[in-house]
Structures are given as structure tokens and as C-alpha cells.
Amino acid sequence: MREKGINVKLAFLKAVLFAVAFAVIPANAFTLDAQGGIANRVSSISQFNMSFYGHWWFPIDKMTFVGVGGGYEELDNVGYVPLSASLWVRLPIGRQVLPVAIGDFGYMIGERHQMFWRAGGGLDIKNGDYSSILLMAGYQYLHHEDRGFVYLHAGILVEI
């Protein structure tokens, strides 16, 4: 009987948290991006590794976003699923083509799981009011491997 009471309380708590979460989120809070490309080791730039990444962003304003990221990367024939906390800043230069800076810090799950960080930048090419084409490049560092990778990505950003 006690277990049933705990389950009811947990269900009520979940419902309240769900309602509060969607009550305070602005209408344009569902901003997503998806990117794909390559990530090459800095020491051997000619060896290509596939890299796919995406983010769910929460807009602070039109120029700054915080969010969570994840994806799939294959680095030196080892598959990883990176999960990260992320920051995106559009620089106030231009109207249709905006330079951006991005940073991620997180954990790579895989055979050689480890912490990682990435820093990069690129271009946010406005497609319309709610979408953009992304061209991104940057540096990614793996903690246990003690080496860096250069990544090049292209993708799309959708602000709903």
C-alpha cells in the first residue's frame, strides 16, 4: 500500500514538473541543429573520420543559446557517442550571413570513453525567419587520448 502512495506522489511530481517546464518556455524554445562532416586528427590531417552532431538549444536571446548536444563520431576506427553541454553565440556582424562561435564540453561514450571539449566557429547563413544553413569548423580535444582533432561540418539550424 505504501508503494502505491509513493507511485502516486511521483506521478503527481512528474506532472507538475512537466507543466511548469512548458509553462515557462517561450514559444521559440525548440531550436535544433543537425550537422555532419569529418573530424581529422591534427597530426594526420589526410585520414578522414565521420562525424555527426546535433544540439537542442534554449535561446537566451536571438544571438545566444545554451543547450545540450549529442551525436556519433568514428575517430581512428573507434565509435563514440558524445554528449555535451553547449554554448552558441552569434556575432553581430552582418544580416544574412552571421559569424558564430560555439563551445562544447562533455563526455564521449565508447570503447575508450573519456571527457572532451570542442571550440569552433563558422557561418550561420539565414535561409528564412526560422532556418539557417550552417558551415562550421573547429578543434576537438580528447582528454585520455591527449590529442586533438579538427572538424568540418555542414548542417541546418531550425528555430521553431
Where in this protein do the model-derived segments appear?
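Cleavable N-terminal export/targeting peptides
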Residues: 1-31
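Short glycine/proline- and aromatic-enriched beta-strand/turn motifs that initiate or cap beta-hairpins
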Residues: 27-74, 153-159
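Conserved beta-strand segments that form the floor/walls of ligand-binding pockets within enzyme
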Residues: 33, 102, 136
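Extracellular loop and loop/strand-boundary signature of outer-membrane beta-barrel proteins
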Residues: 39-40, 72-73, 106-108, 140-143
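Short, solvent-exposed loop/turn segments at secondary-structure boundaries
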Residues: 44-46, 78, 111-114, 145-147
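Short hydrophobic/aromatic beta-strand or adjacent loop that forms the aromatic wall/cage
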Residues: 49-51, 80-84, 149-153
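Gram-negative (and chloroplast) outer-membrane scaffold detector with strong preference
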Residues: 53-133
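Predominantly the C-terminal beta-signal and adjacent terminal strand-loop region
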Residues: 97-98, 119-160
